């Protein structure tokens, strides 16, 4: 069983290619998708100006207000349905959020630390973003008895506050892959792999991935850190590869990109 995650830029620029590639996967799979660019576009059309914040580590992320959460749910649900409708002729596929069967549980971030426009640290309300606390592998295993492909939007469920939460798509993919002890986790990005001095690093051990995460830019550093931890927790390999090429999943399974084992 494999877990595949495609980031928002990949979804925006190569959704049809991703769908075609998913149709050719010959084993059971779980697909986690992003869609941040589409959320931003839709928010602006609705007159809601998106807000982004920067963490002390330099990571820029969406600030999810209650109003923005509603747009996020709407857009992510649309993307999920587009994927399902174009694959249903060939595969038994279902779209899900973490609220379905309480499959992915998260806790709302009550407070977050940001760097303001003056470069100072500030503590602000966390909005409707969450940190994943639990993946119910039994629920997901039962679903895989009936379906070939599960499509997850990056929305987890907070049972305490009875709400869906925006969660990091990478975090969701890593959490699901770890809980399911997946053979392979594929991260499809807008680059060919982990780049150092303009060249793709082909292979890394889990230890090397965690070490390199301290010396590489925001975004990829978290992927490498989580990849190292995921390998140590039972996933056989993590592949970071381009989602913009033809048949990107097959391309990744041919170990083109960066392979962490």
Curated annotation (Swiss-Prot):
Pfam families, per database record: AA_kinase
GO molecular function annotation: acetylglutamate kinase activity; ATP binding; N2-acetyl-L-aminoadipate kinase activity
GO cellular component: cytoplasm
One of the GO BP terms on file: arginine biosynthetic process via ornithine
Listed InterPro entries: AceGlu_kinase-like_sf, AcgluKinase_fam, Asp/Glu/Uridylate_kinase, LysZ
EC number: 2.7.2.17, 2.7.2.19
Pathway(s) this gene product operates in, as recorded in its UniProt entry: Amino-acid biosynthesis; L-lysine biosynthesis via AAA pathway; L-lysine from L-alpha-aminoadipate (Thermus route): step 2/5; Amino-acid biosynthesis; L-arginine biosynthesis
Annotated localization: Cytoplasm
Catalytic activity: [amino-group carrier protein]-C-terminal-N-(1,4-dicarboxybutan-1-yl)-L-glutamine + ATP = [amino-group carrier protein]-C-terminal-N-(1-carboxy-5-phosphooxy-5-oxopentan-1-yl)-L-glutamine + ADP; [amino-group carrier protein]-C-terminal-gamma-(L-glutamyl)-L-glutamate + ATP = [amino-group carrier protein]-C-terminal-gamma-(5-phospho-L-glutamyl)-L-glutamate + ADP
UniProt-annotated binding residues for substrate: 35-36, 62, 166
Keyword Cytoplasm annotated: yes
CDD domains (UniProt xref): AAK_NAGK-UC
Keywords (A to Z) from UniProt: Amino-acid biosynthesis, Arginine biosynthesis, ATP-binding, Cytoplasm, Kinase, Lysine biosynthesis, Nucleotide-binding, Transferase
Main localization (coarse): cytoplasm
Family: Belongs to the acetylglutamate kinase family. LysZ subfamily.
Name used for this protein in its record: [LysW]-aminoadipate/[LysW]-glutamate kinase
Organism per entry: Sulfurisphaera tokodaii (strain DSM 16993 / JCM 10545 / NBRC 100140 / 7) (Sulfolobus tokodaii)
